[in-house]
Each structure stands twice: as C-alpha cells, then as structure tokens.
C-alpha cells in the first residue's frame, strides 16, 4: 500500500488509483491536506484556475408517472394514481422555455419518470417539436434508466434508442439515476430501476457515439463509505474506456440525499448533512476522477457556504441557477440563487464567475 503522499503524486501524474488507495484517501487523509491536494489538481486540469463556471437552464419534468418505486423520491406517482398524473404539454414547455430565454438560459434539462406508455415515438415527437420551435436550445435530456426503460417498452436496443433520440434532437445525456452504482444499494433503494450494469452500458454506448454525458452520485442514505468509493471507481473506469477524442463524462456532480417525506425516511433512514463529509467527497472525487475535468458543487443541496468551500477543495463549477427544480426540492432542498446571487457567491469565494454552456464553453 502506498503512503498518502505517494497516492497524491500518483493521482497528479494521471495514474488511476486502486480501490484500496482511494479508500485510504477517503478514510485516512487529513481533510485540510486532502482538500489542498484536490485543489492543486483542479488548478492543473482546468483551463483557467481563477474561474468558476455557472449556467442558466431550466429543469422541466416530462411526467411524474413512474414505475421504478425509488424509496428516495417524493415526486413520482404510480400509474394507478390518476388524480396526481401529469404529462407536460407542448404549450407548457413553450411557456417555460420563453421565460428561460428571457432570463438568459440556453438549455432545457428534461427528466421525468419511467412511464409505462411513453415509448420512443413520444420522445422523438417531443424533441423534434421543441427543436423546430427553439433550434438554439440545447436538450440535456432523460438519463440512462429512462433510456433503458424506453428501449424495453419500445422493443429496441438501448443503442438504437440513443441513436433515434439523438436524431430527434438530443444534445447530451444527464447522469441521472446513478444514485450509488453498487448492486446491494440499488436493490434496496430503487429495486425496479434498471441495474448498475444497464446504467453503465447505456453510458458506454453514449460515449461510443460521442454523445456528451455527465455522472452523478446521491449519497447519505444506506451506502457505506467504501461503497461511495466503489461508485467513484466505477465511473472513473468507465471514463477510461472512452475513445480518444470523444466527450465521455464532461462533469461529475455529487449531492446529498434529502429525506423529508420519503419512504426511506419512514423506514428510519434520515439525511444528516455534514459539511466536512461533503468536502471530503468532493476532494476524494477530484483525486479519483482525475480523468474528468469538471466537478460541480451542489449548492442546491448543501447550501452556499459549503459549496463555496468546495471550490477550494476540488470543485470548479457552481452549477445552474435552476429556474425550476422539483424532485430534490420535494424532499427538502430549499436553497435558491438568481443570476446575480450565484455570481456574487462565486466572487465571495475568490473566483471570477463565467457563464457557460452544457459543454463548459464560456458563453
């Protein structure tokens, strides 16, 4: 086993840490030292180390009907709960997009549930209609579980499903539905959702197509510390398989589980936020995921001050002002920023804010 200083050097030199080395970082590294090493790595891999990027987009849910039965989600309803059903209409999309454009937004983050009746044709028609009306808006839409679900009910392979979605206007694929990429955890918190292997397969296929993607982690529920590390290693290894010149994962975004009103809470699993733990996750992620350039601080779930600290601990992006967000908010996340507020928070942390697009290019 390498000493901590040797593990740091290995990461800085571009080496892929072993599971044991990553666990040693997470378990043993003094937090201040870990954060400093992560910040040094951030400075060496981003284009401008004095800049922190941010975005204006809108998160619109296609539907709240979902068959996955995730124990951490308050937002969904079952197919038989017809009094709560909704499917967003084109008119509603247009109203939301018009407001987003007024606020300077350039991207629609489209996510929803695993609706048993919404197959590939529904999403093709939706994407084409949105692109015909708003050709300059980027569609950052769905997620690996939704792609797998659409493929299943449409009688297609996931690869063919991705190809048809891209042809219809899909610009990039969010990292939604990762949670913790460990089978033990997934079988408990989201037993009906596509498996770890399916999530990985869809993302790998997206990478082979050169479709930009992101990766996420929702932590702080039933997973162990080492299962968090296993999650990071799985993402890192998947990124290592991306063909040279292809996008792969353009960002990693971890956030804490919010338990209010969820089925997990009713079973005694309550979120306990620790700023120090979050900083340790951000710093460890930077050193383990040394092949992913961008790491986002999740101000929505951890708040302004902790997110600002994360910018000195490996994170280089402050995310979006989130004109609309329903899923995490429904479980207790209540932090908010407007465009001026998010820029001021970045300046207070000692950085220059720069508005970006989904590919992390300055706007």
PLM regions and their residue ranges:
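Auxiliary Fe-S-binding modules of radical SAM enzymes
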Residues: 1-32, 101, 232-233, 240-363
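Conserved short loop/turn motifs at secondary-structure junctions
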Residues: 22-25, 56-59, 112-116, 219-222, ...
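N-terminal pre-triad scaffold of radical SAM enzymes
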Residues: 35-79, 85-111
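Mobile, glycine- and charge-enriched loop segments
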Residues: 50-56, 66, 71-82, 127-132, ...
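Hydrophobic faces of well-ordered beta-strands that scaffold small-molecule active sites
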Residues: 52-58, 108, 139-143, 173-175, ...
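Glycine-rich, proline-tolerant flexible connector loops at the mouths of alpha/beta enzymes
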Residues: 54-60, 81, 109-121, 183, ...
């Amino acid at each position: 086993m390498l000493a901590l200083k040797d593990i740091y050097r290995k990461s800085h030199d571009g080496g892929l840490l072993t599971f044991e080395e990553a666990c040693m970082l997470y378990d043993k590294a003094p937090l201040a030292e870990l954060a400093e090493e992560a910040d040094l790595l951030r400075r060496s891999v981003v284009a401008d180390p004095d800049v922190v990027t941010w975005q204006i987009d809108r998160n619109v849910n296609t539907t709240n009907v979902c068959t996955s039965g995730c124990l951490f989600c308050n937002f969904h309803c079952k197919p038989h709960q017809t009094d709560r059903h909704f499917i967003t209409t084109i008119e509603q999309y247009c109203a939301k997009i018009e407001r987003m454009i007024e606020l300077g937004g350039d991207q629609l983050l489209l996510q929803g549930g695993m609706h048993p009746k919404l197959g590939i044709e529904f999403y093709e028609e939706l994407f084409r209609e949105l692109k015909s009306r708003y050709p300059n808006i980027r569609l950052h839409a769905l997620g690996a579980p939704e792609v797998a679900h659409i493929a299943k009910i449409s009688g297609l392979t996931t690869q063919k499903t991705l190809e048809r979605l891209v042809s219809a206007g899909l610009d990039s694929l969010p990292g939604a539905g990762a949670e913790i990429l460990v089978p033990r955890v997934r079988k408990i918190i989201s037993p009906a959702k596509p498996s770890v292997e399916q999530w990985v397969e869809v993302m790998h296929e997206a990478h082979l197509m050169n479709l930009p993607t992101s990766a996420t982690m929702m932590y702080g529920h039933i997973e162990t510390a080492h299962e968090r590390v296993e999650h990071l290693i799985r993402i890192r290894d998947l990124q290592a398989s991306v063909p040279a010149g292809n996008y792969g994962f353009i960002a990693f975004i971890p956030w804490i589980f919010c338990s209010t009103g969820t089925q997990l809470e009713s079973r005694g699993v309550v979120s306990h936020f620790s700023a120090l733990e979050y900083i340790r996750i951000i710093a460890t992620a930077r050193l383990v995921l040394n092949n992913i350039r961008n790491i986002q601080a999740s101000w929505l779930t951890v708040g302004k001050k902790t997110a600002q600290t994360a910018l000195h601990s490996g994170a280089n992006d402050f995310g979006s002002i989130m004109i609309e967000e329903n899923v995490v908010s429904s479980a207790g996340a209540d932090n908010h920023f407007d465009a001026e507020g998010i820029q001021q928070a970045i300046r207070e942390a000692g950085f220059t804010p720069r508005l970006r697009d989904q590919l992390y290019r300055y706007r």
